[in-house]
């Protein structure tokens, strides 16, 4: 059973000039680099936070996974990272392979070893990240924060954190306890915002755009 301190992490945004949140990247490394240049992202002063799903389906999952080593990049875990971790732990890889994990089977031995080392970093990714900015508090998770009120280290259903689309489908409303909530997981034609909830997976790997939002 996961301890609350392994599920939640907190970041003080005062340590950076700007903080950006990015939607599901899914291996689209070159697209991400292009968008960062367009946003004038400065890796010396800025922080990029991913809503998860760095890997699978796109052309460079290994390159995107390697971003976890960069000091200017952090992420919450997505359902695709979790599928990869589950596959590596159990040797039951069917679900992962059916959902874009076949890139791993095509790696050279050298690159596979690199990926295995990076999956260790994935094990440390939180499910929920709280970012304390100068004038607001932002909560980032992959698919949902499955409660009507946010509370630091509150017990929540982790499967729903990674997989749920209920709030988005039903437009169930906002969440109290923080100023803004940022999710990905469900590819949309354009960013969707209602109440204080923001969905920013705009289907980059399916021919859409890669959405970045500056929260500080």
From Swiss-Prot:
The active site is at 80 (proton donor). It is an enzyme of class 3 (hydrolase). Disulfide bonds: none annotated. Its EC number is 3.1.3.16. Mn(2+) 2 binds at residues 53, 79, 185. Mn(2+) 1 binds at residues 24, 26, 53. Optimum pH is 6-7. It catalyses: O-phospho-L-seryl-[protein] + H2O = L-seryl-[protein] + phosphate; O-phospho-L-threonyl-[protein] + H2O = L-threonyl-[protein] + phosphate. Optimum temperature is 45-55 degrees Celsius. Thermostable. One of its GO terms (cellular component) is cytoplasm. Its cofactor is Mn(2+). GO terms for biological process: RNA decapping. GO terms for molecular function: bis(5'-nucleosyl)-tetraphosphatase (symmetrical) activity; metal ion binding; phosphatase activity; protein serine/threonine phosphatase activity. Keywords: Hydrolase, Manganese, Metal-binding, Protein phosphatase. Inhibited by cadmium, copper, zinc when added cobalt when added concomitantly with manganese. It holds the Pfam family Metallophos. Neither magnesium nor calcium stimulates activity. Belongs to the PPP phosphatase family. PP-1 subfamily. NCBIfam families: PRK11439.1. Can hydrolyze phosphorylated Ser-, Thr- or Tyr-substrates in vitro. The natural substrate is unknown. This is Serine/threonine-protein phosphatase 1. It comes from Salmonella typhimurium (strain LT2 / SGSC1412 / ATCC 700720). The lineage of its organism: Bacteria, Pseudomonadati, Pseudomonadota, Gammaproteobacteria, Enterobacterales. The gene is pphA.
């Amino acid at each position: 059973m996961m301890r609350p301190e392994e599920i939640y992490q907190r970041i003080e945004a005062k340590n950076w000039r700007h903080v950006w949140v990015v939607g599901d990247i899914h291996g689209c490394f070159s697209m991400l680099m292009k968008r960062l240049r367009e946003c004038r992202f400065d890796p010396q002063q800025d922080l990029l936070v991913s809503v998860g799903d760095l890997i699978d389906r796109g052309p460079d999952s290994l390159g995107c996974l390697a971003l976890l080593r960069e000091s200017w990049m952090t992420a919450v875990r997505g359902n695709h990272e979790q599928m990869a971790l589950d596959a590596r732990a159990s040797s039951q890889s069917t679900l992962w392979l059916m959902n874009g994990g076949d890139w791993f089977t095509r790696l050279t031995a050298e690159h596979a070893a690199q990926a295995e080392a990076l999956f260790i970093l994935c094990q440390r990714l939180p499910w929920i990240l709280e970012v304390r900015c100068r004038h607001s508090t932002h909560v980032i998770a992959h698919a949902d924060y499955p409660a009507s009120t946010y509370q630091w280290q509150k017990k929540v259903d982790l499967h729903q954190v990674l997989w749920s689309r209920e709030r988005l489908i039903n437009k169930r409303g906002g969440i109290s306890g923080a100023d803004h909530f940022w999710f990905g997981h469900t590819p949309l034609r354009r960013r969707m915002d209602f109440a204080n909830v923001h969905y920013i997976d705009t289907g980059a790997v399916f021919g859409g755009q890669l959405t970045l939002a500056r929260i500080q």
